[in-house]
């Protein structure tokens, strides 16, 4: 087979042309602009060769069909017309595949996403494997785009308008069995017979177009214009509830799908190409694409230049609580590494094992996993009340109480019972790693590995180094975090590390606004509208008011008075208000409570007469600017290694609005002069804690940006 081509064709003796997709020099297939010519020449051959009875598209990569289109193509577009032209080229290529006179089959194993699914949907039949890595979806919305090569038209035709809209608006992926049930694939088979079954389909008659397998209310709604109007209205409401009007792609997707449904595919494709071109030029899509590039770049990094990580074959976890259980779960279920849990009580071990079983069982029920895979994963988890089995661990992750003496004892215990090469990773959220490693025999093997709760859902991990941490320890810990499904950033030891340090002033200022009489809902709704997933007062309830109160003095001691927490925390703690964990905080909780109403008794407790006095813009500046300022301090003090790491940490760690690119890209887009002027104005009005970080002033004087 030719190694310089991505698409190669071989016609078998039975007359089936097998087209193998194998992009040279890449681990996964992605579609590039240049491939249109390759596919075009193959189509010329197929259109003129009467001996070909059928066609099969299959991947030459072991774990993926096509992971999507190469996003770099969009950055090469200078304007909306260029991007629109790119979409039309893709549409034309897939139209030719669909219009072939013989049956065309997509044989799918692994990721079939974006442009990959658009190619597969242009085929007449789709057969996929029951492999757990097989997933079909259109994730373009996550890049601020819509599918541009026919996806907005073909998906609703195959699975129905309701299901198609949901998939395109959320980027939701379907596993093999789900795709079969939805009508997206024709058959699900074991990987070993994928090609054989695909060839069988290619030798059958070209199938007639079928209607989506709709039942019940969905069938009734999609059959009439009135019903479809309800579907489009509901889809828009649900999507905008999350998007808050911050993602232009939402409206464009709904309009484009609707165009095709009401005026036919040709009109829909025209609208799709134009909308793709327009969205590609929006600042939101630009920022979302930069995040994609940053995370892709980070996947290739070890955290320590030129140092290869050691292999991690077994992990020990100290503590079977919420964090310990979550860490054990991602180690076994995502990394595929056996985890040994140690706790002082059998209940702790039982809790940790049950935590994993519950989540795996949910996957089985949703058809994301087979029962046999659940059992195999559970066999990777074991527990003990002592250190038996820890002598074979490569990394031990500690997730016990936030107590320095206890954590130092854990270091000593692990050094005694584990191998000399074992890494000790602490999941502390506030204690300095330098102090935890202070009495260690092998301090170079002590590192921070800070997960965020809930561990199985939050994508970030902070890898915290103290001055003595070895490069080998850093590289091995970064590698483990990636296998656990995390996006790790390496940060330097210091109070609050990075994420909690930039979060603290944001929440403190929200609390001060509340004490000044600003209603809780007004503060929270304003920042949700700005783009955060939850408001700062809700976040205080979720993090724990007691936790925030405990962390504040540590930050003040290490970093100064700008971290002083409002006195309100003491009153709240005295009233036993810890937040969501004990169902008593700023909001009401409990099964009988509908929605999420404010607990208005908190106003009288804090002697507040709530009244909206600040505008949305004022609330945003008061809460957000200290976070941006603190991010600049962290860069100045080399707590983070780069603006890129700071942006990824804020987006994945606290939900900083992704469409704004992160704190540093946001400051660049606003202009440092604007940021510094606003900080100086607030410093005069609200106190010295708003004084701009020296780095911001230096950069402004020199005319620099964070991203050149």
Swiss-Prot record:
Residues 310-708 are annotated as: 3-hydroxyacyl-CoA dehydrogenase. Its main location: cytoplasm. Its EC number is 4.2.1.17, 5.1.2.3, 1.1.1.35. Pathway: Lipid metabolism; fatty acid beta-oxidation. GO terms for molecular function: 3-hydroxybutyryl-CoA epimerase activity; enoyl-CoA hydratase activity; long-chain-3-hydroxyacyl-CoA dehydrogenase activity; NAD+ binding. It comes from the Bacteria. Gene3D superfamilies: 1.10.1040.50, 2-enoyl-CoA Hydratase, Chain A, domain 1, NAD(P)-binding Rossmann-like Domain. Heterotetramer of two alpha chains (FadJ) and two beta chains (FadI). Catalyzes the formation of a hydroxyacyl-CoA by addition of water on enoyl-CoA. Also exhibits 3-hydroxyacyl-CoA epimerase and 3-hydroxyacyl-CoA dehydrogenase activities. NCBIfam families: FadJ, PRK11154.1. This is Fatty acid oxidation complex subunit alpha. It comes from Idiomarina loihiensis (strain ATCC BAA-735 / DSM 15497 / L2-TR). The lineage of its organism: Bacteria, Pseudomonadati, Pseudomonadota, Gammaproteobacteria, Alteromonadales. The gene is fadJ.
């Amino acid at each position: 087979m030719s190694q310089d081509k991505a698409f190669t064709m071989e016609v078998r003796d039975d007359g089936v042309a097998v087209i193998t997709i194998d992009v040279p020099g890449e681990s996964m297939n992605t579609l590039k602009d240049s491939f249109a010519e390759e596919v075009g020449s193959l189509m010329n051959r197929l259109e003129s060769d009467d001996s070909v009875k059928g066609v099969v598209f299959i991947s030459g990569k072991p774990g993926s069909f096509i992971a999507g289109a190469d996003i770099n193509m969009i950055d090469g577009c200078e304007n909306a017309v260029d991007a629109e032209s790119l979409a039309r080229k893709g549409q034309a290529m897939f139209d030719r595949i669909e219009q072939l006179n013989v049956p065309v089959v997509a044989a799918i194993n692994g990721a079939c996403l974006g442009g990959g699914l658009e190619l597969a949907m242009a085929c007449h039949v789709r057969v996929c494997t029951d492999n757990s890595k097989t997933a079909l979806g259109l994730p373009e919305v996550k890049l601020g785009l819509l599918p541009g090569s026919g996806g907005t038209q073909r998906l609703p035709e195959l699975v129905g308008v309701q299901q198609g809209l949901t998939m395109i608006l959320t980027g939701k992926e379907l596993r093999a069995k789900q795709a079969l049930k939805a009508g997206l694939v024709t058959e699900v088979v074991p990987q070993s017979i994928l090609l054989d079954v695909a060839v069988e389909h290619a030798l059958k008659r070209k199938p007639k177009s079928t209607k989506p397998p709709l039942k019940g209310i969905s069938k009734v709604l999609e059959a009439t214009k009135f019903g479809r109007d309800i579907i489009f209205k509901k889809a828009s409401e649900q999507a905008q509830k999350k998007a808050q009007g911050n993602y232009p792609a939402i409206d464009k997707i709904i309009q484009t799908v609707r165009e095709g449904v009401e005026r036919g595919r040709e009109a829909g494709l025209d609208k799709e190409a134009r909308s793709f071109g327009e969205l590609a030029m929006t600042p939101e899509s630009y920022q979302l694409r930069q995040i994609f590039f940053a995370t892709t770049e980070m996947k290739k990094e070890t955290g320590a230049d030129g140092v290869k990580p050691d292999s991690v074959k077994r992990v020990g976890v100290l503590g079977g609580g919420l964090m310990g259980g979550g860490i054990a779960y991602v180690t076994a279920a995502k990394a595929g590494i056996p985890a040994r849990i140690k706790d002082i009580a059998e209940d702790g071990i039982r809790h940790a094992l049950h935590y994993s079983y519950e989540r795996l069982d949910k996957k089985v029920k949703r058809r994301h996993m087979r029962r046999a895979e659940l059992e195999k994963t559970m066999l990777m988890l074991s527990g003990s009340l002592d250190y038996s089995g820890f002598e074979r661990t490569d990394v031990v992750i500690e997730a016990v109480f936030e107590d320095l003496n206890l954590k130092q004892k854990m270091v000593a215990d692990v050094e005694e019972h584990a191998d000399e090469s074992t890494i000790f990773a602490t999941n502390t959220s506030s204690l300095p790693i330098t102090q935890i490693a202070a009495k260690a025999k092998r301090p170079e093997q002590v590192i921070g590995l800070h997960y965020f709760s809930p561990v199985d859902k939050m994508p970030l991990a902070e890898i915290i180094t103290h001055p003595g941490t070895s490069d080998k320890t850093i590289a091995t810990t970064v590698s483990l975090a990636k296998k656990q499904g995390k996006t790790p950033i390496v940060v330097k030891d210091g109070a609050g590390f990075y994420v909690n340090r930039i979060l603290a002033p944001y929440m403190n200022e929200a609390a001060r606004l509340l004490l000044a009489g600003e209603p809780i809902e007004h503060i929270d709704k304003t920042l949700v509208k700005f783009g955060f997933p939850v408001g700062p007062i809700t976040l205080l309830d979720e993090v724990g008011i007691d936790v925030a109160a405990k962390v504040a003095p540590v930050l003040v001691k290490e970093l100064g008075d700008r971290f002083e927490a409002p006195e309100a925390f003491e009153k709240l703690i005295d009233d036993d208000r810890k937040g969501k964990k004990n169902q008593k905080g700023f909001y009401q909780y409990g099964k009988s409570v509908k929605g999420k109403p404010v607990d208005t008794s908190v106003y009288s407790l804090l002697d507040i007469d709530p009244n909206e006095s600040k505008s949305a813009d004022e609330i945003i500046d008061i809460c957000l600017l200290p976070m941006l300022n603190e991010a600049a301090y962290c860069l100045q003090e080399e707590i983070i290694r780069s603006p890129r790491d700071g942006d990824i940490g804020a987006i994945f760690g606290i939900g900083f609005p992704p469409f704004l690119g992160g704190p540093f890209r946001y400051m660049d887009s606003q202009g440092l002069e604007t940021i510094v002027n606003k900080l100086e104005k607030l410093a005069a009005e609200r106190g010295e804690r708003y004084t701009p970080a020296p780095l911001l002033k230096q950069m402004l004087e020199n005319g620099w940006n964070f991203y050149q």
